[in-house]
Amino acid sequence: MPMTLGYWDIRGLAHAIRLLLEYTDTSYEDKKYTMGDAPDYDRSQWLSEKFKLGLDFPNLPYLIDGSHKITQSNAILRYLARKHNLCGETEEERIRVDILENQAMDTRIQLAMVCYSPDFEKKKPEYLEGLPEKMKLYSEFLGKQPWFAGNKVTYVDFLVYDVLDQHRIFEPKCLDAFPNLKDFMGRFEGLKKISDYMKSSRFLSKPIFAKMAFWNPK
């Protein structure tokens, strides 16, 4: 029986999950909820189901796999990763995975706070000023390894790919000074299942955020 992934009809927090589902060749339904337009941003399509799905903490995204009903995007990623041994194999690798999962979410939230802010035009230059230092830390952490935990793909590569790609859309030159990050992005996009997915009609790269965001390329 296929899994069900529920989320808004945007990229948002589901992008890394969708990528991981595709990479692992998992059968799933990508259930997309539509939000209304301004000024109300009607959410009734989701709210009408929110408390009927048996979720402990009803929220989007959610993943339903038989009796397993999971919310929180990183909990979903970890669940899928455990099924496919993509959590790191050594203690050192798992430590790197744990660190990077949290670091990537911090970076994601920092960008989102700028993009959802009514003061976006004021905050954007400030954010761009600090961006090279952020990218430098990711570059140094990756080093000469092909993947962020080491020699094998783990679920945080999906998370970091998404976060770096969002920043690449936000500021197209932000990775230019970091060849290893650019190589990582190309290596990830070159994975057969990922490449096939990105060429398919199922692939959703934009919009990144919900409709109330002040920066949200279509």
Curated annotation (Swiss-Prot):
GO cellular component terms, A-Z: cytosol; mitochondrion
Disulfide bonds, paired cysteine numbers: none
InterPro entries (UniProt xref): Glutathione-S-Trfase_C-like (IPR010987), Glutathione-S-Trfase_C_sf (IPR036282), Glutathione_S-Trfase (IPR040079), Glutathione_S-Trfase_N (IPR004045), GST_C (IPR004046), GST_mu (IPR003081), GST_superfamily (IPR050213), Thioredoxin-like_sf (IPR036249)
Enzyme class: transferase
Species this protein is from: Mus musculus
Residue span(s) of domain GST N-terminal: 2-88
UniProt-recorded name of the protein: Glutathione S-transferase Mu 2
Family: Belongs to the GST superfamily. Mu family.
Primary residence: cytoplasm
Pfam families: GST_C, GST_N
Subunit details: Homodimer.
